Amino acid sequence: LESFGNHPSFCMFSLGNELWGSQKELNSILKTYKELDNRHLYTQGSNNFQWFPAQLENDDFFVGVRLAGDRLIRGSYAMCDAPQGHIQTAAPSTMKDYDSAIHPNRAAHSSEASEDGTVQIQFGTTMKTVKASEANADFIPTVPIVTHEIGQYETFPNFEEIEKYTGSIKARNFEVFKERLDEAGLLPLDKAFFESSGKLAAACYKEELEAVFRSRTLAGFQLLDLQDFSGQGTALVGMLDAFMEPKGIITPEEYRHFNDRAVLLARFEKYVYADNEPFKAHIELAYFDKSNIDGRVCTVTVKDSDSTKIFSESYGINYSGENYLDIANIILNCSQIMAQRYD
């Protein structure tokens, strides 16, 4: 705080990542820091106490992945951090948001500590036993909520990246992966594996981020990650490589369709329809830009695989400064559409 408190990008301060220990001591540290410099927003940490989240008196915002055992606020989880999220367990859809998890209409399932007051927690990539009290299933933070480390969708290695390591750091991990693939007789398929896994990862990131932008009571998100992380056993979780350069999976323009100051969204129940079913969609806009869009027009167009227009309507936007706008409901008769080919 004394060295970097004036830095223009220093606006939020977290005590650490996935901490355990004394809530009283953490709160005391926050109090001391806020008395020293109250210009920033402070929080006890990111995803502290994991299955047993709590809001401290001096928290200005809350960061976590769940609010109780089954009140999940991100799309996917590791097996050691179960239950898993909707992207892993539910049929593909664009209906999911986290508003009902943040403000539930029922008592959620609460994880329970064992008789000796301990619980198994995620610790790195393994498990660890710690002291814990029973989680509060009705926990609803009264401060803004930020969802923690969303994403983490991995791609297959791109072995062409090995050539980029021209300095003291070498891509030994990629070299090992390539050698193993060659030994298995699968090296000729490496590009197909990379491209296919990349398309799946991009689709998962799209749903992960759109679910966040559909959530009107969620204040923000921490993404893991924009770029690959080459340490700790390798995490190829970025749409960019470790050099912050595109992998060729998705363009910046395509990425901004679902992660930008303005994100246009369509809620519909599924991706596959029979010809006797109606296609229904609710069109909405998550908007965090400063420009006044009152009176602007939103045109909704549906095209087939040959780019022939099947549906097109324009809707006026009524805007008075809000971040979430409901624009229109559309209904489309699928019997009018020939079966489409998906490449």
What name fits each language-model region?
Residues 75-312:
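Substrate-binding clefts and catalytic carboxylate motifs of secreted carbohydrate-active enzymes
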Residues 3-7, 35-39, 215, 290-293, ...:
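Secondary-structure transition/capping motifs at alpha-helix termini
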Residues 1-56:
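Active-site neighborhood of glycoside hydrolase catalytic domains
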Residues 296, 308-339:
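Intrinsically disordered, low-complexity Pro/Gly/Ser/Thr-rich segments with frequent PxxP/GP/PP motifs
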Residues 31-32, 58-63, 164, 239-240:
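Short, hinge-like loop/turn segments at secondary-structure boundaries
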Residues 2-10, 68-77:
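Short, basic, helix/turn surface patches
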Residues 279-285, 329-332, 343:
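Buried hydrophobic-core signal for structured, non-transmembrane domains
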Residues 44-69, 74:
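Catalytic-site neighborhoods of secreted/periplasmic enzymes
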